């Protein structure tokens, strides 16, 4: 088991954990000269039915954790884009894209509704962000990282 806000070194692998806004932790993994970020359940889980007090705390907590990634060059990131959140689906992804340098971003937690990716790309007018977001079409899709742009 791992706990939030810790650094673990296992051989040539370094793992830093961030506190989730839901369950578990997010991971920043460095190995073989590459950096991989996996958000887990770290997201700005804004919801209509919970009120501004809880939503405000959620947003502050999310931003606080993401600020810990500033200055990191991330090669591959897995970031939440959950269509169950309706109009708030992309709040976490949008903040991540504006504040973290990541070469390739794979949206996740989409519950097989991959249309949220294209909706975000159409909504976002900054191609520096949208060009880094990978289009996912199906569950368990395989990407050949050696042949990406």
Report the location of each language-model feature.
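Core dinuclear metal-dependent hydrolase active-site scaffold
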Residues: 1-73, 138-149
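Active-site neighborhood of phospho(di)ester-bond hydrolases with catalytic His/Asp-centered motifs
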Residues: 37-41, 57, 76-84, 104-111, ...
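Binuclear metal-ion centers of metallo-dependent hydrolases, dominated by the metallo-beta-lactamase
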Residues: 1-7, 89-149
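A short, acidic, amphipathic alpha-helical segment used as a generic capping/interface helix at domain edges
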Residues: 61-67, 86-95
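Active-site environment of divalent metal-dependent phosphoester hydrolases
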Residues: 23-25, 44-48, 83-89, 108-118
């Amino acid at each position: 088991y791992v706990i939030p806000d810790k650094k673990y070194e296992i051989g040539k692998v370094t793992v830093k954990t961030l506190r989730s806004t839901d369950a578990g932790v997010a991971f920043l993994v460095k190995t073989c000269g590459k950096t991989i970020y996996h958000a887990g359940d770290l997201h700005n889980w804004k919801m209509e039915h919970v009120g501004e007090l809880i939503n405000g705390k959620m947003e502050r907590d999310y931003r606080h954790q993401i600020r810990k990634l500033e200055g990191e060059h991330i090669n591959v990131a897995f970031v939440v884009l959950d269509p169950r959140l309706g109009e708030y689906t992309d709040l976490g992804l949008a903040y991540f894209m504006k504040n973290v340098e990541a070469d390739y971003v794979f949206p996740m937690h989409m519950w097989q509704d991959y249309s949220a990716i294209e909706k975000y790309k159409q909504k976002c007018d900054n191609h520096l962000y949208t060009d880094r977001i990978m289009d996912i079409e199906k569950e368990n899709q395989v990407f050949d990282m050696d042949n990406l742009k």
